[in-house]
Every structure is written in structure tokens, then in C-alpha cells.
């Protein structure tokens, strides 16, 4: 439903559903399973990006289960049984990528391979964690499989061969392999051999990082990112600044996320999606009204929001965020999901001993109804505040003073090193 810019609407919460699940435990076989000793499970974390220049491994895991079904070298990768891929328009393309990767691993057995949860937070098929989890799974059964450095070379060749659009792929690979319980993985500085990452410990103690997605956000999109060395340095410093309790908020991670987001929606060489711009307007207004919302970054597939620690469990705040987004949207929103992102470990083989170290996935989904406001009605139900849709000008977004990161225009691709 298209909504006129000057209309007022009633946004009603029809239902709110909180859930917590542990996919790793769900797919982990027990010792009572007769196939337990013949099957291996590996996990590789999905990632989210910040300011187009930093990557965090999160608790959402891509899982691969493999079992040797023939103890001989395969004649070709077509002999491997690959199952449980999500149904989408590019099934055969994905299978070709996987089989090309498997060929280069030079396996000595024929396997039955199952993939679980290969979609990232935005709903896109995430090739990097799929390949890394597959490699980790094969490590448990193969005696002379490639090491990590050769793995990176193989992955880069596959990405190049199939012309996959994965911005800053080397930083994504590093985050997936190493995890982010200690570091955010920043794109490498040109010509520098120094560790360019920032520490995540204090950020994690102070903030809830939440990925918000509406039913209007696309899942099949070509990622457009604008990494730069300047933004990379600011982001690294911002993470390190979180360590000092007396640091001014305007040089911490949430502030730089917000400034970057403001700049992104009006960047001349970027075609901003309608849902991105509307979300930007909604979150800016919300930040002015609720101190629990500390910062945000509008992205193509959703919104990365930094809340005060433990605010994710405040149903009233979650409702306010959902209603604000629905109110400012020019298209009618019918659902909003919230995923609590916890810092995830690096890729690993899953065993009974370590399966409990994987954080559960916490999610909230709100069903929403949007209708025109009748005389005497308020514009929202489910919270105490009222929200009205107002006409706005895109140029107004940039009138406020920006943090330094929003003024950087030098771009840098760490994959070109």
C-alpha cells in the first residue's frame, strides 16, 4: 500500500513474539545417534558491517554437516551429495560455486553434505561462511586438506571466477575465521603490516547491537559499500575509545555509525532505497526522543541499531522503534524483526564439549497494521507516545553537525592490495 506523504495513519501492534533458539544444539547429534561417529558438524559465523569499513562476526552461525559415504577419491565433485540449500533463484549457481570449491580442496572421500542457516541477517545467501564451514567440516575427516592460507587463496579464486560481489572480502574472511569476541576486523591500511583492528570487549559490555529488518527491506540486492582508510581509522579508534568510561559519547561507536548513516543516504554516487531513507528519518527522530537508542546505521538489508545494554529486552522500547519505522515509511509495513547480535567465535568444528559456547539467537518479531487515522483516533496503539507521518526534505537530514567520519570521501578497497 502506497501512503501519501501528508497523510496521518494509525499504526497498531497486532502481536509481538519473542524467541530464543540454539541452532548449533539443534543440529548437533547426540552420542545415542547411530550415525554420530560418522558425521561431523562445523560452524562459521555470519558477519555484519559497520561504516563500510569494519566487520563483526556474530552469534548467527552457518552450519555444515558432513559424512563420508564412500571411502575413495571422488571422480568429480558431482559425486558429493549436497542438500539443504535454501530455495532461491540461483540454486544452480550456488551449487556450481560449492562444487568448484570442493574440487580445489582435493578430498579423498565422497561426502553427504548438509548446509543449515546459510542466510545472513539481511536474508542474503552468505558464501564466505558457507565455504569456511565446509572447509572446517572436511578438516575433521581429511588428513592432508589445505591450511588456512591456502584456503584464503582458494576462496579468492572462487570469488573471482564467479564474479561474486563481496565488498572487502579479505576482512570478511578474517572475521569469519577468527571471530569478534576480541576484535572488530577493519580493512587493512594501505601498505601497513600493523594490526589494524579495534577491541570489542568494552563495546560489548556497554551496548546491545540489534539488526532491525522490515518486510520492505530487500533480500536480493547487490551490496554497495564505500570503504575508506579514513573511516577505518575512525571506527578502530571509536572501538578503542569505548574502554574509557569518561569518553565523550560523540567519539564512540554509536555516534560514528549515525554520522556515517546520515552521509550514506545522500551520497551522490549511491542510489538510496526508499526504505533506507524512510528508516533514516524514523531513527533520527527516535534518537531525539529516547536515550536508550544510542546510534544506528541504515543499510540496504536492514538497520544496525546500538542500544543501551539490555535494552533489547524492553518490549515498550522495541514497540516504539517498530512504530516509528512504520509511521515514517511511505509503503505499508506489516512486520518488523529485531535480532540481538552477540559477538561470535571464529569458525570451528562443533563437538559435544564446545557446543554450549555458542550464544543462543534472540529474536523479536512484531506484526503491524497500518490504517488511516479517523477523527478522534491516535496514530499508534501499543505504546503511550503518538507518532505522525510528516512530509520531509532529503536535504534536511544533513543540516545537523556531522561527526568527522561523515566528511571522509577517500575510498579504499583492501581487496586490491
Curated annotation (Swiss-Prot):
Record bears the keyword Transport: no
Nucleus keyword on record: yes
Induction or repression: Down-regulated by at least 4 X-linked genes, termed X-signal elements including fox-1 and sex-1. High levels of xol-1 in males correlate with low sdc-2 expression, preventing dosage compensation. Conversely, low levels of xol-1 in hermaphrodites correlate with high sdc-2 expression and the assembly of the dosage compensation complex on the X chromosome.
Single Gene Ontology BP annotation: mRNA alternative trans-splicing
Pfam families the record matches: Xol-1_GHMP-like, Xol-1_N
Region (Disordered): 373-417
Disruption phenotype: Worms are XO-lethal, due to inappropriate activating dosage compensation where only 1 X chromosome is present. In contrast xol-1 overexpression is XX-lethal, deactivating the dosage compensation pathway and elevating the expression of X chromosome genes to lethal levels in hermaphrodites.
Cellular component terms per the entry's GO annotation: nucleus
Compartments (UniProt record): Nucleus
Biased composition annotated in UniProt, kind: Acidic residues: 391-403
Keywords: Developmental protein, Differentiation, Nucleus
Alphabetical list of InterPro entries matching this protein: GHMP_kinase_C_sf, Ribosomal_Su5_D2-typ_SF, Ribsml_uS5_D2-typ_fold_subgr, Xol-1_GHMP-like, Xol-1_N
Role noted for this protein: Sex-determining factor that is required for sexual differentiation and X chromosome dosage compensation to promote male development. High expression during gastrulation triggers male development, while low expression at that time triggers hermaphrodite development. Although related to GHMP kinase, its mode of action remains unclear.
Similarity field: Belongs to the GHMP kinase family. Xol-1 subfamily.
Protein name: XO lethal protein 1
Organism per entry: Caenorhabditis elegans
The gene coding this protein: xol-1
